[in-house]
From Swiss-Prot:
Pfam families noted in UniProt: zf-MYND (PF01753)
Stated name of the protein: MYND-type zinc finger protein samB
Any single Gene Ontology cellular-component annotation: cytoplasm
InterPro entries: ARM-type_fold, MYND-type_zinc_finger, Znf_MYND
Coiled coil (UniProt feature): none
Length: 605
């Protein structure tokens, strides 16, 4: 469709647009979404590379137009969401890369309420997720205690050793008395054993710890039993959680696929036959992709037993599927491994008033329910440089906080820790995991209306650059929230799963009082359960609050946000003894502010 007011027929343009070489202010007033997205995409490049374009936008009303686009709110339509994100990127580029006068114009264009609303929405969703995670953890802990009570009461009356024909009741006795060393027979005569025997067959390759293992040897009939007996699917999962694989896997010293040699086609194992390779991608032999000993291939009936290959003829086939991590993640969800998989998750119950200064993250692993999903990948990867690019692709590198303990709980060898040195920074969105279990029709589009991690990070970065000017501090301490950007109704839809019938009451933004102080919102992002990038920029903003106002004689303001007193003369207030940055008018203000100040109070040399 052609826009009547902005069409240029002589150059065959349906509307005026901005290109990488031409800036036209009229393009920002376009009413069609598609050409406006095209113009904003090019404007994002221009605001990054051209200082002149940034200066022009401050005098021709371009910044005000971009802020108006942001205040229209987020829509569930993908194109509208794209338009909002591009406009937000343009404003951030102008404020971060612009001069002092340009940054002042960004604040005067009423950008602070937009940032305050984004931060407030993010905090609300995080608190929702934390409350739900706490309730889930309490429910799981109470269920585990109720299961553990009868076991502990019956334990004294039980014999230490029980008959081999019993099922899983023999597990406590096996933990107390390890089985004796057993020899590996060349053949297994009984191919149809009971469930407990299936577990014994899988344990037969275990060699004594005193003699170092040299290879993974698995019998032909043991593999037949796995493929034919459907009960193995349950027995293997229960057993692999308890089995220390340091005695079942070969050493990783050899770099040529365990140092095993190729075999002839006539002497291949059944797992290496062509029938087992259908649909499996070929993978190179490497120490990080071994053929797992307990991988389930398929339920296909195998050929009769053949003579087992000699020790020199066994090899880790390149066509075997490397699904060790997938099996390990399944073990974490297995109900039978309740107390074994429990230490994987460490959820912090309180957010701000714990005095544990050495705590790394709120989540030390990955929870099964993914309720509290504010994951700090910077903690696990020990990031040395700041990278604002946040990708939402989830891979296995996000669970490398404690490789030895986590891999041991998942049934993986410690030598198989994923190599994340060259892996990209992975920051999963807290909203995608929070909404994942609420995928009803009424809430499918709710995710697009909420701020993402990169939106919060760019908001904090923009605030860090514009909040260092003391003459603009009143804009930050007396602001408001944008009604069309709030997510209160969307959060209610996530909890209820249905869309509310009554329409939303439209609030006039100009009638709202300026009673929102943005600094307390920013201070909440200094808590350690946020990512390190968020913590860094939030700390920069809070340190800007402690700057002295040179225009007023170099006096400072009390750092407690509920106080806000200014010094009457220089050095009237006392500084914090630890960081030597913040100043407080009294001990009461310092005690009240310490709840959050301790997160960004860093010792100065």
């Amino acid at each position: 469709m052609r826009e009547v007011n902005f069409s240029i027929p002589n150059v065959n343009k349906a509307s005026v647009n901005i290109t990488t070489t031409l800036y036209d202010r009229r393009a920002l007033d376009c009413t069609s979404t598609l050409p406006l997205i095209n113009s904003l995409n090019h404007l994002a490049y221009l605001t990054t590379s051209s200082a002149r374009i940034r200066d022009i936008l401050t005098v021709d009303g371009g910044i005000e137009r971009l802020v108006c686009i942001l205040k229209e709110g987020r829509s569930r339509d993908l194109m509208e969401m794209w338009k909002w994100s591009l406009a937000f990127q343009c404003v951030v580029n102008i404020g971060v890369r612009g001069s002092e006068s340009v940054r002042t114009r960004v604040v005067e264009a009423d950008m602070v309420p937009v940032i305050a609303t984004i931060l407030d929405n993010y905090i609300k969703v995080v608190e929702k997720a934390r409350a739900r995670a706490d309730s889930e953890s309490q429910r799981h802990s109470s269920r585990h205690h109720s299961k553990a009570a009868p076991i502990s009461s019956d334990a004294p009356s039980r014999p230490v050793y029980v008959d081999q024909s019993t099922n899983t009741e023999q597990r406590p006795s096996r933990r107390q008395a390890p089985p004796p060393h057993i020899e590996i027979p060349p053949f297994y005569q009984d191919s149809h054993a009971s469930d407990s025997n299936a577990m014994d067959i899988t344990s037969s390759p275990r060699v004594p710890v005193t003699s170092p293992p040299e290879r993974s040897t698995f019998g032909q009939d043991a593999h037949n039993l796995r493929s034919n007996d459907t009960r193995y699917a349950h027995a293997a999962h229960r057993y692999r959680v308890m089995q220390p694989l340091a005695t079942a896997l070969p050493p990783m010293d050899a770099a040529d696929g365990f140092g095993l040699r190729p075999v002839r086609d006539t002497e291949r194992l059944p797992s290496m036959l062509p029938g087992f390779q259908n649909g499996l991608a070929s993978q190179p032999d490497s120490p990080t992709t071994p053929s797992g000993p307990a991988q389930l291939r398929s339920n296909t009936q195998v050929a009769p037993a053949r003579p087992r290959p000699t020790l020199r003829q066994q090899q880790s086939a390149s066509g075997e599927s490397d699904d060790g991590n997938g099996e390990g993640s399944t073990l974490g969800d297995d109900p039978g491994s309740g107390e074994t998989a429990e230490p994987i998750v460490g959820i912090q119950n309180r957010m701000e008033i714990d005095d544990d200064g050495d705590r790394q993250t709120v989540l030390e692993g990955v929870s099964n329910t993914h309720d509290l999903t504010v994951n700090d990948t910077s903690e696990s990867q020990e990031a040395e440089t700041f990278n604002i690019t946040h990708r939402s692709t989830v891979d296995g590198s996000m669970i490398n906080n404690d490789a030895t303990r986590t891999n041991g709980a998942l049934g993986l060898s410690p030598t198989q820790a994923p190599n994340t040195a060259n892996s990209p920074a992975v920051v999963p969105s807290p909203y995608s995991l929070y909404v994942r279990d609420r995928s009803t029709t009424a809430v499918q589009g709710v995710l697009t209306t909420m701020p993402k991690d990169e939106d919060v990070l760019m908001s904090l970065q923009l605030l860090a650059y514009v909040s260092k000017y003391c003459n603009l501090r009143s804009y930050f301490q007396h602001s408001h929230l944008v009604p069309k950007l709030k997510v209160d109704r969307e959060l209610q839809m996530l909890e209820d799963g249905v869309s509310p019938i009554e329409p939303a009451e439209e609030e006039d933004e100009y009638l709202l009082p300026d009673d929102v102080n943005i600094f307390p919102l920013v201070e909440k992002f200094t808590v350690r359960h946020h990512s390190k990038d968020m913590q860094y920029w939030a700390c920069v903003v809070m340190r800007n609050l402690c700057r002295k106002d040179e225009s007023r004689g170099g006096i400072r303001q009390c750092a407690y946000y509920k106080c806000g007193k200014w010094e009457e003369f220089q050095r009237q207030f006392a500084k914090c003894r630890r960081c030597r940055r913040t100043k407080y008018c009294s001990k009461d203000c310092q005690k009240a502010a310490w709840v959050y100040h301790r997160h960004w109070c860093h010792t100065t040399p």
